[in-house]
Amino acid sequence: MTTRTKGRGHTAATTQNDRMPGPELSGWISEQLMTGRIPVSDIFCDIENNPGLCYASQMQQTKPNPKTRNSQTQTDPICNHSFEEVVQTLASLATVVQQQTIASESLEQRITSLENGLKPVYDMAKTISSLNRVCAEMVAKYDLLVMTTGRATATAAATEAYWAEHGQPPPGPSLYEESAIRGKIESRDETVPQSVREAFNNLDSTTSLTEENFGKPDISAKDLRNIMYDHLPGFGTAFHQLVQVICKLGKDSNSLDIIHAEFQASLAEGDSPQCALIQITKRVPIFQDAAPPVIHIRSRGDIPRACQKSLRPVPPSPKIDRGWVCVFQLQDGKTLGLKI
């Protein structure tokens, strides 16, 4: 054991076995450094004269005492070297994210403009549906006139004269008188061509609000029902049920012509078919304060599916002009009201 005294009066003890300092020596050196008893330069800068102490200080840096671990910040030169690469990577990543953001905004704008451009197509659906119905009626009328191959070359009177003379209709397209064809068909005239017979039957089953049947003084409940059905979308809805109730009560009170005129007037004003039916129940006198009819059914399954969501508990005094179409009464006595 040898003792060396340094110039400032501090004593350091070294042995050959102290080349590898233990935790006691490291802790002691840390304590002396923290209290200022040993200058920092003696430990870190005097490598040639005191290699043992410098080695101990180096070990102290790599293995700090738990008491001083959080009081000192160490910087690894490797981390310092790669910090610039991290910055460059983050910068390039930010650039890519910015480009993606710009592309997303551009794509969103294009999608919005595309949606705006397709709105007229959505609006065309109602127009196409209306055209489809009108065209079906027009084709039936067109077939009845037997003009599918060209323009008519003769009047209805000339057609009748030719038919009476030759016992058969003239060749080519011709005009036919509806009443004359009806008479020939009802008399089972064999000279009526099958195509004319089918065309007449198709037109007879296609009823619509035209000038001809609008002025018809003796419209039947069946014709009025078919006319109203042609204007309603879907099948078996609450409004279809309302049509049946209106036609039934109108027939019983001989008010079919009034109902027909009211329906046509509402449509002419631009009302929807559903609105026109509601207007009938409010304007035609026979429906004011009228109780809805009672329909006896076996089970709820007998009610059309489209009406299921419109069923309500029956109030004490339901009225048609207040939206109550009819009352379904089951076999067990339970009642359900159809409300629109």
From Swiss-Prot:
**Gene Ontology molecular function terms on file:** RNA binding
Q: Which residues carry this modification: Phosphothreonine?
A: 206, 210
Note the InterPro entries from the entry.
Filo_VP35, VP35_IID, VP35_IID_b-sht, VP35_IID_hlx
Crosslink Glycyl lysine isopeptide (Lys-Gly) (interchain with G-Cter in ubiquitin) sits at which residues?
A: 309
The superkingdom listed in its UniProt entry is Viruses
Q: Where in this protein does the record say Phosphoserine is found?
A: 187, 205, 208, 317
> Do you know which CDD domains this protein is assigned to?
V35-RBD_P-protein-C_like
Q: Which GO terms describe its cellular component?
A: host cell cytoplasm; virion component
> Which residues does UniProt call coiled coil?
96-116
Q: Where is this region: Disordered?
A: 1-24
Q: Where in the cell is it found?
A: Virion; Host cytoplasm
- Gene3D superfamilies found in the cross-reference section: Filoviridae VP35, C-terminal inhibitory domain, beta-sheet subdomain, Filoviridae VP35, C-terminal inhibitory domain, helical subdomain
Q: Please list the residue ranges annotated as the VP35 IID domain.
A: 215-340
Q: Which Pfam families match?
A: Filo_VP35
After translation, how is this protein modified? Phosphorylated by host IKBKE. Phosphorylation contributes to efficient viral replication and transcription. Ubiquitinated by host TRIM6 to facilitate virus replication.
Q: What is the predominant subcellular site recorded for this chain?
A: virion
**Which GO biological process entries does UniProt record here?**
symbiont-mediated suppression of host cytoplasmic pattern recognition receptor signaling pathway via inhibition of IKBKE activity; symbiont-mediated suppression of host cytoplasmic pattern recognition receptor signaling pathway via inhibition of IRF7 activity; symbiont-mediated suppression of host cytoplasmic pattern recognition receptor signaling pathway via inhibition of TBK1 activity; symbiont-mediated suppression of host toll-like receptor signaling pathway
Which keywords does this Swiss-Prot/TrEMBL entry list? Coiled coil, Host cytoplasm, Host-virus interaction, Inhibition of host IKBKE by virus, Inhibition of host innate immune response by virus, Inhibition of host IRF7 by virus, Inhibition of host RLR pathway by virus, Inhibition of host TBK1 by virus, Inhibition of host TLR pathway by virus, Interferon antiviral system evasion, Isopeptide bond, Phosphoprotein, RNA-binding, Suppressor of RNA silencing, Transcription, Ubl conjugation, Viral immunoevasion, Viral RNA replication, Virion
Binding partners and assembly: Homodimer. Homooligomer; via the coiled coil domain. Interacts with nucleoprotein NP and polymerase L; VP35 bridges L and NP and allows the formation of the polymerase complex. Also interacts with VP30; this interaction is regulated by VP30 phosphorylation. Interacts with host IKBKE and TBK1; the interactions lead to inhibition of cellular antiviral response by blocking necessary interactions of IKBKE and TBK1 with their substrate IRF3.
Q: What does this protein do?
A: Plays an essential role in viral RNA synthesis and also a role in suppressing innate immune signaling. Acts as a polymerase cofactor in the RNA polymerase transcription and replication complexes. Serves as nucleoprotein/NP monomer chaperone prior to the formation of the large oligomeric RNA-bound complexes. Regulates RNA synthesis by modulating NP-RNA interactions and interacting with DYNLL1. VP35-NP interaction controls the switch between RNA-bound NP and free NP and thus the switch between genome replication and genome packaging into the nucleocapsid.
Q: This protein is called what?
A: Polymerase cofactor VP35
| Gene field | VP35
